[in-house]
């Protein structure tokens, strides 16, 4: 069972409760944002279960501009180098289709690392989930996090 946490108390409770994987975030009340480097380092010192970090530079939709993508790529690189076992993100265009180029920019930042790649709940707002799932697989993601498109 994966548990999303955005503070140390939640992390400890998740570990003690039997979580098998942690999704580390900040600002879950805002839909989740990228956690700090310090939070990841502390989390890694408190548990040995896999920790995947959310990569999301801001609240709102999943259509990111060039600057957002640069920030997310750099955050991905730094957090993987700091020990993240995986990254969780998703990029869409203005029509709610997968932003392949945006995803590739972030994936390229971590391509030399053996990590897990999860496409997050941006999947829940795409127009064509079957086509999108195939594109996600082709890009190299290993997981899709979804509510079954409840957000649509």
What residues fall within each predicted segment?
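Histidine/lysine/aspartate-rich catalytic loop segments that bind and position anionic ligands
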Residues: 114-152
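Glycine-enriched alpha-helix->loop->beta-strand junction motifs that scaffold or abut catalytic
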Residues: 16-22, 47-50, 83-86, 111-114, ...
């Amino acid at each position: 069972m994966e548990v999303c946490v955005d503070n140390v108390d939640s992390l400890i409770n998740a570990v003690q409760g039997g979580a098998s994987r942690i999704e580390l975030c900040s600002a879950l009340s805002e839909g989740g944002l990228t956690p700090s480097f310090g939070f990841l380092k502390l989390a890694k010192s408190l548990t040995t279960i896999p920790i995947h970090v959310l990569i999301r530079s801001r609240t709102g939709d999943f259509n990111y501009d060039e600057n957002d993508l640069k920030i997310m790529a750099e955050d991905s690189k730094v957090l993987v180098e700091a020990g993240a076992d995986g990254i969780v993100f998703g990029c869409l265009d203005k029509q709610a289709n997968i932003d392949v180029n945006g995803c590739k920019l972030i994936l390229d930042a971590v391509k030399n690392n053996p990590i897990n790649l999860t496409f997050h709940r941006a999947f829940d707002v795409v127009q064509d989930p079957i086509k999108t799932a195939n594109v996600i697989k082709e890009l190299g993601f290993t997981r899709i996090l979804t509510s079954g498109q409840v957000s649509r």
